[in-house]
């Protein structure tokens, strides 16, 4: 990867997009952005609050606006929210403005990684199990992730460092 192209990380919640993104940006000396953190920084409230007050539609509008602004930058690593790919406009922009890396993970891994986090609005369910919600999200979203991915990384039990260096190796051959 001779010139610094934008790198966009997509995938479901709990896949490790933010963690991998931060480490990848550091290794490549690139600027890192997390779309959820950018929304929180600009609004002064957390994502859960936005979901409670504005609903998912209100949140998605904010997310689309912020991602559209961020991807106009050059030489960045962006960790997107799991549902950002629901927008055709965002999918098209990500595809045309950088390398899209899909961090693929199982529902079982998501359950382990998200069980202690009470800040995930889509997992605040009453009569439905979290596993059922994650399975439904995977059913609808995984084909969208796959449709725009330039590179797919199966997240497994490898260390963060090993995954980051594997991604860098793939990017060098891209």
Curated annotation (Swiss-Prot):
GO biological process: amino acid biosynthetic process; aromatic amino acid family biosynthetic process; chorismate biosynthetic process
Reported cofactor(s): Mg(2+)
Gene: aroK
A GO term, aspect molecular function: magnesium ion binding
Name recorded for this polypeptide: Shikimate kinase
HAMAP family per record: Shikimate_kinase
Cofactor comment text: Binds 1 Mg(2+) ion per subunit.
Transmembrane segments: none
Subcellular localization(s) per the UniProt record: Cytoplasm
Record-listed ATP binding positions: 14-19, 120, 158
Pfam families, sorted: SKI
Pathway note: Metabolic intermediate biosynthesis; chorismate biosynthesis; chorismate from D-erythrose 4-phosphate and phosphoenolpyruvate: step 5/7
Cellular compartments per GO CC: cytosol
PANTHER family associated with the record: SHIKIMATE KINASE, SHIKIMATE KINASE 1, CHLOROPLASTIC
Binding site for substrate: 36, 60, 82, 141
The organism's taxonomic lineage, starting at the top: Bacteria, Pseudomonadati, Pseudomonadota, Gammaproteobacteria, Enterobacterales
Quaternary structure and partners: Monomer.
EC number: 2.7.1.71
Annotated residues for binding of Mg(2+): 18
Catalysis performed (reactions): shikimate + ATP = 3-phosphoshikimate + ADP + H(+)
Superkingdom of origin organism: Bacteria
């Amino acid at each position: 990867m001779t010139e610094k192209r934008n790198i966009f990380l997509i995938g479901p919640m709990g896949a490790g997009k933010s963690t991998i993104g931060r480490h990848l940006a550091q290794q490549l000396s690139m600027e890192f952005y997390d779309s959820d953190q950018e929304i929180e920084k600009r609004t002064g409230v957390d994502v859960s609050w936005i979901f409670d007050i504005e609903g998912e539609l209100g949140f998605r509008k904010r997310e689309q606006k912020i991602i559209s602004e961020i991807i106009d930058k050059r030489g960045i690593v962006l960790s997107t929210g799991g549902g950002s790919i629901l927008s055709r406009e965002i999918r098209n922009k990500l595809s045309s403005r950088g390398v899209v890396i899909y961090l693929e993970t199982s529902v079982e891994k998501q359950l382990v990684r998200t069980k202690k986090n009470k800040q995930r609005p889509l997992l605040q369910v009453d009569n439905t199990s979290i596993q059922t919600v994650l399975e439904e999200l995977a059913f609808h979203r995984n084909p969208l992730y796959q449709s725009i991915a330039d590179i797919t990384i199966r997240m497994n039990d490898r260390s963060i460092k090993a995954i980051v260096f594997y991604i860098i190796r793939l990017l060098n051959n891209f």
